[in-house]
Design a protein with these regions (language model features):
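Nucleotide and nucleotide-moiety/phosphate-recognizing core
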Residues: 1-27, 36-52, 58-64, 71, ...
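Conserved TIR/SEFIR loop-to-helix hotspot centered on a Trp-containing motif
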Residues: 30
């Protein structure tokens, strides 16, 4: 595809954010996220917008990260992520219609 990277909006999980918290950025590094590393490799740049959705950190250091991120959330985490789905959709719509700066101001945090 011949889509400019700045027109690609990537949504990813983020263990460094509490479950349900959103963080939108216009560009940035992979921050240790393997999926973002792969996207950066294929796009050839870090200059693309991304929306990170907090999933929280695993309950203990020995917990397999892939199992944590791909697992089914429970309890309060599930409720927070359900609310985050709607907010993330709204943030994406805002980004597309009003621009990344407006979306960051409105939805980060």
């Amino acid at each position: 595809f011949k889509i400019p990277p700045e027109r690609v909006l990537v949504v990813s999980d983020e263990v460094a954010l509490v479950p349900g918290r959103l963080r939108m950025r216009a560009s940035g590094s992979a921050g240790g996220h393997n999926g973002l590393k792969n996207i950066i490799l294929h796009l050839g740049t870090e200059n693309f917008p991304r929306l990170r959705v907090g999933v929280g950190s695993p309950p203990h250091p020995d917990y397999d990260m892939a199992d944590w991120v791909m697992g089914v959330p429970r309890g309060e985490d599930a409720a927070a992520l359900e609310k985050a789905e709607e907010r993330a959709a709204d943030a994406i719509e805002c980004c597309v219609q009003q621009g990344i700066d407006r979306a960051m101001n409105r939805y980060n945090g």
